[in-house]
Amino acid sequence: MIRLHDTMAREKRPFVPLNPQRITMYVCGPTVYGRAHIGNARPAVVFDTLARLIRHEFGEQSLIYARNVTDVDDKIIASAETEGVDPSVITERYERHYLEDMGALGVRPPDIAPHATQEIGAMTAMIEQLVASGNAYEAEGHVLFSVPSDADYGVLSKRDRDQMIAGARVEVAPYKRDPADFVLWKPSAEEVIGWDSPWGRGRPGWHVECSAMIARHLGETIDIHGGGLDLIFPHHENEIAQSRCAHGGLPLARFWVHNGFVDMGAEKMSKSLGNVITPAELLEQGHRGETLRLALLSAHYRQPLPWTENLVSQAKSTLDRLYRAAGEADPTAVDDGVIEALRDDLNTPLALSRLSALDGGALKASAHLLGLLGSSSADWFQGDTDAAAVEARIAERAEAKKNRDFAAADRIRDELKADGIVLEDGAGGTTWRRE
């Protein structure tokens, strides 16, 4: 049985879905105004791995996995104004980049990818419900959620009132009845993207987007809601409040699962801090997506992950070792030890250590569950390389050695090494692989 750490309960609990034939999981996806950094990739990889585990345990068709795209946001609007283009140019560009980058890391597309701009009707309908129930109010063209109207507010983050106000993203506006109240709808100037609504032309607040899309595509109560630790407050806390009030007190999610940060030095990797490195940059440097995926899985998902060159180098060495051990075997059965590790709150470090004890088909099948060893060993060691050209240089080197021109032989070896090709001399001749 799968056991997951539930942020709400502050403990690991057995995962028993509401309906094993229709398991629902929603993960907060990208706000598409810039290139994703490797910290943004961590939840994509973590929840992709959890989705693989759920499908292994309950059946390939058992899970409906939704990951949204926030394509209306103040940062998107600012980027569009800077470039002098329509916001859709920004969002389409960076969504395309996001999907390319995550695909390179072996992240499968979600079953549903709702876009905020395509769900405005669902959002305004939810806001109208909250106004009608007395949980929201209109003020100066805005609609705000009344935090004091929800007696259970704070159940996820366990923050006291002063912490809530300090942790909110915005300064206290004069039109708020209470400093903790948050925006459901905000007015848009004529030149800014917006939609007609009962409260005038405007656009949705960040939090109501996810609540409305979850209800529309997955239902009022889902099995798992995921995201990064930084989303616990205010985003997920606010989602819980508005969904509960709109749906007669029903819980939004039965499990809240949050991944830890990727750190650069002593700080969390963050665009606002400017200490980011992107998958695109790492791929351009010659690292393979599978290497980056293994690096992201090397620490338990709830723990911080310090990102270093050594981490990536170790991940590459581990994959070299695993590909050699797997050979060209076809996948067989997944190893029980790997399964048990993943069932225990997605313990990927333990699962990876178990992989090191396997070989052949069992290794291949078990690694697939982690999204690893998706290539053949030949492709891993020699793929994307002009094999004929390398073999020609090896033949040239062999001829030089035959003629006892060892300086020429060493030069060829060094030139290939500089191109990332490692030669290995053995009794059966010379073989090669990429570094």
Give residue spans per PLM region.
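Short, well-structured beta-strand/strand-turn elements
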Residues: 61-64, 134-140, 422-424
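N-terminal, positively charged nucleic-acid-binding surface of large information/translation enzymes
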Residues: 9, 18-106, 432
